Amino acid sequence: MKKSDKKKLSGEIIKRLAKEYPDAKCHLDFNSPFELIVSTVLAAQCTDIRVNMVMVPLYKIKYKSPKNIIKDGEDNFRENIKSINFFNNKAKAVLSICKTVVDKYNGQIPQTMDELTSLAGVGRKSASVVMGNCFGKNDVIIVDTHLKRVATRLGLIENENPEKIEIELKGIIPDNEQFHFSMRIGELGRQICKAKKPDCEGCFMNDICVSAFK
């Protein structure tokens, strides 16, 4: 599909997503950029539900700031998150993030892509989640498994590599729509366009989707 055709298609998709999911929100529960960046790192290859179950009580009782995690220590933090996949590596990453944030940023989570991705365990996807949800940055594409699957099925992207997908979508989605597009297409992926059994019959995109009913 030509880029001009993809732009036209994306415009219609953006309108439909906005109508269907006007208030799409992050599925990780958080009250601060600190909580979201920690939960985002912990959510890699784990469910948001599990991370919320483990971390929400801990944020309220023990971990109200990066300094609290540093003070508690890596061993205790690891023990508290052991029901989360890959807890050993994630505990190391979170402790590293907390130390960097305290030492370099006066305890505040940085706001730019370069600064965020310099933190341990934080890639472009996690950085985009924090930038969009906490700092009001609309010009971020969150390339997660749902966006990748749904955007491919809709015919918007042809790449497999996350960074190439990001570049491709930034070329056809207006800057001020990119974050909302990411959140809303994620909802479509969770609720209708599922990995194994997409509900094409019940999908509000089935008349413009190149993969519908296939």
Residue ranges of model-derived segments:
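Catalytic cores of DNA base-excision repair glycosylases
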Residues: 2-214
